[in-house]
Amino acid sequence: MYHFFPGGKQELAVQAIAHTAERYRELLDRVFAKSTDIGQVTVTWFNWAARALQETDYADGCPIGTVACEPASSNEALRQATQAVFASWQSRVAAELIGAGVPTAQARRLATFAVASPEGAILLARAHRSTRPLRDTGRVVADTLRAATDRG
């Protein structure tokens, strides 16, 4: 292991975060490529997360969120890695909103809301053993983003 990851377990963990983030980013890109309706994209994303959670019997949530909640709180390299992932997702969503005519400052705030919302909804879904928190939250986020783009 140390041959490929001279920094040991920490370097391996940071690389795993980067790899996982890239997979999620590719998925997000595919979802955005299928629709120009930010609301539909949002519902699709939340529904995908709900299905994935249900398929694992509520055992798996967002792996980036899991690392951000626990190990990253005591490890600066992991905190920075998870922060970079969330920032890249926020930038991606903000770019879509800006492209739809939403003012930059508002788009950034909405992107933070859109990225933070599934994390909380996943926690509730796991606690309730139900996909309803994800599906309900997805609809609210979708409606909020749609309203912003309609005014944009």
For the regions a language model picked out, list residue spans one by one.
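Amphipathic alpha-helical segments used for helix-helix packing
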Residues: 40-42, 56-80
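Solvent-exposed, charged/polar functional surfaces in cytosolic regulatory/catalytic domains
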Residues: 19, 23-30, 48, 52, ...
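An amphipathic alpha-helix adjacent to DNA-recognition modules
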Residues: 3-32, 43, 83, 90
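Helix-loop "lid/cap" segments that line or gate small-molecule binding pockets
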Residues: 30-32, 50-54, 64-73, 96
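Amphipathic C-terminal alpha-helical segment
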Residues: 52-55, 95, 115-132, 144-151
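Hydrophobic alpha-helical segments that form the core
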Residues: 65, 104-124, 136, 140-144
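Hydrophobic alpha-helical bundle segments that form small-molecule/ligand-binding pockets
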Residues: 35, 74-76, 86-111, 147-152
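Hydrophobic alpha-helical connector segments
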Residues: 15-18, 28-60, 110-114
